[in-house]
Amino acid sequence: MNIRGMKKTIVIALTLMCNSMAFAQKAETIESIVSNSHEPEWYGQQAEAWQKIVDADPKDEWAWRNLLRAADYYVMFNHGYGKSWEEQDKTRPADVIRKMEAAIPDSYVLNLCKCRFSLSADSVAARRGDFARRAVELMPEDACAEDVNYLACRMWITDPDSPLVKELFTRSYRNRYYPARIMHFNRNMLMCMQQDAIYFANGDLDTAPMKMIQEALGERTDVTIINVSFLHADSFMKALYKRLGIKPLDINVQDYGQYGEDWYKHYEADIMMYLIKESKRPAYFSPTNPKTTIIDKDSIYNEGLILKYSPKQYDNFAVAMHNVKEVYDLEYLAEPDLVYDTWHTSGQTDLNHVTLLMNLISKFKKKGDDAQAEHLYNILSKCVERSTIFAEPEGKEAMLKGLKEQLEAKK
């Protein structure tokens, strides 16, 4: 190689090295994967970036908070935690917690992080909610909105009757943590349920926002919200049985070994069916709840944006059409000046409306309600047209074509 070529190679190599170092050193706030997710490698790089900040200032609580979150997500997405406490205690997040205990003992961030990740020695205290309560006691006025929401959920699970549940969810509502579009979706589901219903949620986006509406606004507090993961929490279940006025179910997880790694799905399904039958209350499921196929898919009916359990057949399309005309607020899907928030799940939530409601366009046509069919078509098609989550334009075109076919269906 000649000297000029060698110099060029060295310059390129140094440039790449500097860019790589700059990228690796840039620490960013680690957000919940519900709002903004990344590849595992990104979390690994962020863990290294936050580690440097912690090393420089071991008293920096914000740095510790982000270090634990980055390390936790990296392990979670990369190879998981294994099946035993012994394996979990050997992971990097466990090491972060131990070092945090020495650097910032009994701090707000330490207790917050112990809610998210427990060492085997802390597992009982974590289940009791000890760390959540202590974190709330130490929580600063300017606490991160995401962390306030997380502590509200932890208190709801571990001490459902505590006044802190209402206080924290109200604070989270005022923080405007969840985007308005996700709040709209949850309110639509909440408002269409029958009196004293029980509602089985699946994830963060169809649980906490609905509870927030109940606690902060006082709307539809007659509905009992149950995230399926809460079925494993003793404190939550004890309060739930009391609220529903039924005896606790005598159930043992050891009896579900025959299902292998899917044991928890059948365990949760059996508890849900017990709650439905014993309480004799109307039962609903979020549209993303996979447990409905285990319970009895022939007894699950779509009522628009929500699923209802019914052992008897009924005209669920009539209910869904009523919800669209009289209950749901869908106008926000077609707002002309909409600017999407930064949550990647907001666009997905919008398209859930399209998937769940598009077949009602032809139903309205067949009923002779052309105006409502046209109105629903316009809302849903505008929602699809401006969506930014399609990987390929063909996907958007196919969905728009499907909507058009619904509108042009013969009566």
Q: Model-flagged regions — what are they?
A:
Residues 25-195, 215-411:
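ER/secretory pathway lumenal C-terminal domains and tails of membrane proteins involved
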Residues 4-5, 180, 201, 352:
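Residue-level detector of secondary-structure boundary/capping sites
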Residues 208-209:
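Phosphate- and divalent-cation-binding pockets in alpha/beta enzyme and binding domains
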Residues 200-204, 228-229:
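Short His-Asn-centered micro-motif
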Residues 212:
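Substrate-binding cleft/loops of secretory-pathway carbohydrate-active enzymes
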Residues 1-29:
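Bacterial Sec-dependent N-terminal signal peptides
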